[in-house]
A protein has these predicted regions:
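Short, loop-centered acidic/histidine patches that primarily coordinate divalent metals
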Residues: 51-52, 108
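Positively charged, low-complexity, intrinsically disordered RNA-binding extensions
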Residues: 66-111
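Short Lys/Arg-rich amphipathic alpha-helical segments
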Residues: 1-48, 54-60, 66-80, 85
């Protein structure tokens, strides 16, 4: 599961870099239970969901502000570019959420 937040200063180049980084991060366990394998190594799949709340600012008051999150037009384009790049890198099964939709997503963290 990749929860992708986009901020106002993000660029296409950064989206491409991040997609590659996500695929290359060694976050999966090997035979010795050491985090030593990447998404490529485990022939993994990806579920990518856009999430502007990752840029919530909770410093003032009791209601989060989302002023650092990119406008929907910019965020949607970078989200789609990120997804396209993950696919082009050879990840076979890439699922996506619907940009801007109110979705219920369940995650089970391991570790």
């Amino acid at each position: 599961m990749i929860l992708l937040g986009v901020t106002q200063s993000d660029t296409t180049e950064q989206a491409i870099w991040l997609a590659k980084k996500c695929c290359e991060l060694r976050i999966f366990s090997d035979e010795q239970d050491k985090m030593n394998l990447s998404l490529f190594d485990v022939d993994g799949e990806a579920m990518i969901v856009s999430n502007f709340t990752l840029y919530a600012d909770c410093k003032k008051g009791r209601r989060p502000a989302y002023v650092r999150a990119a406008r929907p037009e910019q965020a949607d384009g970078l989200y789609l570019r990120f997804v396209e790049e993950i696919r082009s890198l050879g990840i076979k099964n890439v699922q996506t959420g619907e940009f801007g939709a109110d979705m219920q997503v369940s995650i089970t963290n391991d570790g």
